[in-house]
């Protein structure tokens, strides 16, 4: 049966995967967009975060034309994600951090309150997103026998076709 899901929730994903498994469906892997809480929900199933969605997250934080050299370099690095291996990407991200750590960790003081805060919040958010998602960005490399795609693009194209048929 087909039904429309109004709101995607982590609990809904858990229920639907369990329902599929109860029907005897063997789920070899899950490819997702990085929805908070979803990446570490299925500990017994390989989960690949869509690399394209990760790039979109970076662009959302940094814009398409970032101003600072650090943000420009991080955006450029993120654009190599889909062509990189895990080892190469992690090494490049570590080099980026070495070069820009001081800038990334700069703090400013609010003159009214006297409290300090990170000066480059959006850059930190972009970098932290990459660091946080690294364990799931290259799952496809860890399980070559499963032929896991690195992005959801193929799936989203199929969903568009199905929606037109409904």
Residue ranges and their predicted role:
Residues 14-18, 62-65, 73, 153:
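Surface-exposed beta-strand edges and their flanking turn/coil or helix-capping segments
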Residues 29-75:
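Conserved beta-strand -> loop -> alpha-helix junction used to position metal-binding or nucleic-acid-contacting
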Residues 22-42, 75-166:
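Acidic/histidine-rich catalytic cores and adjacent linkers
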Residues 2-25, 29:
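Active-site beta-loop-alpha junctions of metal-dependent nucleic acid enzymes
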Residues 7-11, 32, 49-52, 83, ...:
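Short, amphipathic alpha-helical segments
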Residues 4-7, 34, 56, 159:
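Short, flexible loop/turn elements at secondary-structure junctions
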């Amino acid at each position: 049966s087909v039904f429309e899901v109004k709101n995607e929730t982590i609990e809904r994903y858990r229920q639907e995967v369990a329902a599929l498994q109860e029907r005897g469906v063997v789920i070899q892997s899950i490819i997702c967009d990085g929805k908070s809480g979803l990446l570490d929900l299925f500990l017994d199933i390989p989960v690949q975060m869509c690399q394209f969605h990760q790039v979109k997250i970076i662009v959302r934080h940094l814009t398409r034309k970032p101003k600072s050299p650090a943000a420009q370099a991080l955006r450029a690095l993120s654009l190599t994600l889909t062509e990189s291996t895990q080892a190469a990407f992690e090494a490049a991200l570590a080099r980026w951090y070495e070069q820009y750590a001081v800038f990334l960790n700069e703090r400013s003081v609010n003159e009214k309150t006297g409290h300090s805060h990170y000066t480059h919040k959006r850059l930190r958010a972009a970098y932290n997103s990459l660091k946080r998602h690294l364990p799931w960005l290259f799952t496809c490399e860890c399980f070559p026998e499963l032929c896991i795609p690195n992005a959801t693009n193929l799936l989203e194209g199929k969903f568009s076709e199905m929606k037109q048929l409904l």
